[in-house]
């Protein structure tokens, strides 16, 4: 499996990981062969690149939980980007409470480990995925420590927002 930038994709290449849209809807299943329209779609979707299987490489196993994590992470990246843009533009954070409750409900009662081994595609990906992974970890730890719900919300919010200065410094440099 190797990462291939969107501009270097060719028809016939097989996807190693699924591609989801910002709502978590599956666009392309893993092991799907790319087509010219699929490549154009990936470019329009704003993907920096995708993971491709080598021609003779078998499809590596992925657990249902890993696939769900990949899907949720894609949704969370778009939601976090929207939240941080609202903050930057001084707009009301109407969707933030739903986003926060989604993280708390998915990871606040989880009794098993989460595989945070993920693939970063850009500095943008790094910031968003790092903030989301930190928020998930904080949520899991806080729940394990039986922190009150309000403290858990505060900690998870801090984990999601603490890197916003890093994002803004990249924009203005």
What annotation goes with each model-predicted range?
Residues 1-100:
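Terminal helices and disordered tails flanking the catalytic cores of nucleotide-processing hydrolases
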Residues 55-170:
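Acidic/His-rich, divalent-metal-binding segments that scaffold phosphate/diphosphate chemistry
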């Amino acid at each position: 499996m190797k990462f291939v930038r969107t501009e270097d994709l060719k028809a016939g290449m097989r996807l190693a990981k699924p591609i989801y849209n910002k709502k978590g809807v599956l666009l392309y299943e893993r092991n799907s062969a790319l087509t010219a329209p699929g490549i154009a779609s990936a470019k329009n979707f704003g993907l920096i690149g995708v993971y491709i299987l080598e021609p003779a490489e078998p499809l590596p196993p992925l657990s249902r939980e890993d696939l769900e994590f990949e899907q949720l992470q894609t949704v969370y990246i778009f939601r976090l980007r929207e939240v941080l843009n609202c903050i930057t533009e001084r707009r009301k954070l109407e969707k933030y409470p739903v986003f926060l409750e989604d993280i708390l409900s998915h990871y606040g009662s989880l009794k098993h480990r989460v595989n945070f081994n993920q693939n970063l595609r850009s500095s943008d990906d790094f910031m968003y995925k790092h903030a989301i992974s930190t928020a998930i970890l904080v949520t899991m730890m806080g729940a394990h420590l039986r922190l009150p719900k309000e403290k858990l919300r505060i900690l998870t919010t801090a984990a999601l927002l603490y890197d916003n200065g890093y994002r803004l410094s990249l924009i203005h440099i």
